[in-house]
Amino acid sequence: MMCGFASNQSPKKLSSKKSSATNVHLEISPVKHHPPCKVYENVQGSCLDSAICTTVAKCADLTDDLPVHNKENLLHRLNDLETNSYEEYSALQDSGYSSILQNDSPCQDETDRKVSDIQVRETPKNFMSYQRPFHTLSKINLPILRFEEAVCSTLKKMRKTNKKIDWNAVDVVCGGNYGLEHLIGKSMGLERFDILAELFHRDFKHLLTKILRHLSAMDLINVISVSTTWRKLLQKDNWAYNAYKLGCKELCEKRAKVSSHTATRDESLCRVPLASVQKVAASSLCTSKKQSKNKNGGLSCNRLAEFIEVAQTLKNDQSLKVCVDCGSPAKHDPCLHRAICTRESCKLDFCTRCSCKYHFSKSCLMSKPGSYRIPSEPLPGSKKSKQNLRRL
């Protein structure tokens, strides 16, 4: 076997040019190459001797293990490599799995399986049992799907026993609590829809307060007269109910001021010839004072408004009286001493002298003597007669 170095060759025969070349490769970008010192050459020579001796010994050890480099040994080794690669490839083909990548191997497949098993084992059981599919969640959340499922299940059960469909069973299912009253769009297509009542039934107080804040006093008066539900929702809102009360008071005061110019004196028997000349009507203020004297309390604002409305429809020879039964305004004819109540549910026709049913030409049946007193004529020169003259 040929070797790179001979054992008899001395290291001193190496040229200085080669040593300087090796030193140049080790240095880092020198700017100027100075000539080496003599001491440095001696040290470098000793280092090279030791390095060459070690490399020669290592090469000798390696050459003992390696086979002889001839043609027969080389062909034998190539044949062994081809047989090994063919056996591995045939094993992969027989197993039914062959990958293009060279790094894939059955050992790697086993490690992948172990890792997947470890990952499955590490997942907690509570989490795996808690997970549900998406369609079950949607069925639970949507009331229409729950109702549909209940109807289909009942129809299936009935189909097994009877071929005919009994729609009464569907009505029974509809009576269940599925929350269908809260569905969006269930009131679509209706001509009229009470939004305030729906908000009140669903207890949306914050929305009702915002709506009522935008209404005036007259609007609140109209709201309270629509229905009982609107009255309740207005009474529950303190601010709106107080505004409604103030609006009612202001309205009554305005109507009283407007009707003050129509105030006239009370009718009397001796004033019959003048009935066709002047309009005789009872003053709203006078009637309220009389009612307060006769009864504890006075007429309410609504009752006062009724009297004012009826007074505007009176004829020249008519006046107002209070109904004996219901206290509503009654149109009085002083010539006949007859009064008829204007209330539709009452419509009492009574005599103003005896407060009984009107008896036409018959004499009055006095239940209590002295209960009815014919008003005397005013004395000439008295205060009342002077007022009558001024009015004429």
Swiss-Prot record:
<dbReference type="GO" id="GO:0007088">
    <property type="term" value="P:regulation of mitotic nuclear division"/>
</dbReference>
<dbReference type="GO" id="GO:0045835">
    <property type="term" value="P:negative regulation of meiotic nuclear division"/>
</dbReference>
<dbReference type="GO" id="GO:0005819">
    <property type="term" value="C:spindle"/>
</dbReference>
<feature type="binding site">
    <location>
        <position position="354"/>
    </location>
    <ligand>
        <name>Zn(2+) 2</name>
    </ligand>
</feature>
<dbReference type="GO" id="GO:1904667">
    <property type="term" value="P:negative regulation of ubiquitin protein ligase activity"/>
</dbReference>
<feature type="domain" description="F-box">
    <location>
        <begin position="197"/>
        <end position="244"/>
    </location>
</feature>
<feature type="binding site">
    <location>
        <position position="359"/>
    </location>
    <ligand>
        <name>Zn(2+) 2</name>
    </ligand>
</feature>
<keyword id="KW-0206">Cytoskeleton</keyword>
<comment type="function">
    <text>Regulates progression through early mitosis by inhibiting the anaphase promoting complex/cyclosome (APC). Binds to the APC activator cdc20 to prevent APC activation. Can also bind directly to the APC to inhibit substrate-binding. Required to arrest unfertilized eggs at metaphase of meiosis II, by preventing their release from metaphase of meiosis II, through inhibition of APC-dependent cyclin B destruction leading to stabilization of cyclin B-cdk1 complex activity.</text>
</comment>
<comment type="subunit">
    <text>Part of a SCF (SKP1-cullin-F-box) protein ligase complex. Interacts with btrc. Interacts with skp1. Interacts with cdc20. Interacts with pin1; stabilizes fbxo5 by preventing its association with btrc in an isomerization-dependent pathway; this interaction is present during G2 phase and prevents fbxo5 degradation. Interacts with plk1.</text>
</comment>
<dbReference type="GO" id="GO:0008270">
    <property type="term" value="F:zinc ion binding"/>
</dbReference>
<keyword id="KW-0833">Ubl conjugation pathway</keyword>
<feature type="compositionally biased region" description="Low complexity">
    <location>
        <begin position="7"/>
        <end position="20"/>
    </location>
</feature>
<keyword id="KW-0479">Metal-binding</keyword>
<feature type="binding site">
    <location>
        <position position="364"/>
    </location>
    <ligand>
        <name>Zn(2+) 2</name>
    </ligand>
</feature>
<keyword id="KW-0863">Zinc-finger</keyword>
<feature type="zinc finger region" description="ZBR-type">
    <location>
        <begin position="319"/>
        <end position="367"/>
    </location>
</feature>
<dbReference type="GO" id="GO:0005813">
    <property type="term" value="C:centrosome"/>
</dbReference>
<keyword id="KW-0862">Zinc</keyword>
<dbReference type="InterPro" id="IPR044064">
    <property type="entry name" value="ZF_ZBR"/>
</dbReference>
<protein>
    <recommendedName>
        <fullName>F-box only protein 5-A</fullName>
    </recommendedName>
</protein>
<feature type="binding site">
    <location>
        <position position="346"/>
    </location>
    <ligand>
        <name>Zn(2+) 1</name>
    </ligand>
</feature>
<comment type="pathway">
    <text>Protein modification; protein ubiquitination.</text>
</comment>
<dbReference type="InterPro" id="IPR036047">
    <property type="entry name" value="F-box-like_dom_sf"/>
</dbReference>
<dbReference type="Pfam" id="PF00646">
    <property type="entry name" value="F-box"/>
</dbReference>
<dbReference type="InterPro" id="IPR001810">
    <property type="entry name" value="F-box_dom"/>
</dbReference>
<feature type="region of interest" description="Disordered">
    <location>
        <begin position="1"/>
        <end position="21"/>
    </location>
</feature>
<dbReference type="GO" id="GO:0106061">
    <property type="term" value="P:negative regulation of exit from meiosis"/>
</dbReference>
<feature type="binding site">
    <location>
        <position position="351"/>
    </location>
    <ligand>
        <name>Zn(2+) 2</name>
    </ligand>
</feature>
<keyword id="KW-0539">Nucleus</keyword>
<keyword id="KW-0963">Cytoplasm</keyword>
<keyword id="KW-0131">Cell cycle</keyword>
<feature type="binding site">
    <location>
        <position position="341"/>
    </location>
    <ligand>
        <name>Zn(2+) 1</name>
    </ligand>
</feature>
<dbReference type="GO" id="GO:0051301">
    <property type="term" value="P:cell division"/>
</dbReference>
<dbReference type="GO" id="GO:0005634">
    <property type="term" value="C:nucleus"/>
</dbReference>
<feature type="binding site">
    <location>
        <position position="323"/>
    </location>
    <ligand>
        <name>Zn(2+) 1</name>
    </ligand>
</feature>
<dbReference type="GO" id="GO:0045841">
    <property type="term" value="P:negative regulation of mitotic metaphase/anaphase transition"/>
</dbReference>
<dbReference type="InterPro" id="IPR047147">
    <property type="entry name" value="FBX5_43"/>
</dbReference>
<dbReference type="GO" id="GO:0005737">
    <property type="term" value="C:cytoplasm"/>
</dbReference>
<feature type="binding site">
    <location>
        <position position="326"/>
    </location>
    <ligand>
        <name>Zn(2+) 1</name>
    </ligand>
</feature>
<dbReference type="GO" id="GO:0051726">
    <property type="term" value="P:regulation of cell cycle"/>
</dbReference>
<keyword id="KW-0498">Mitosis</keyword>
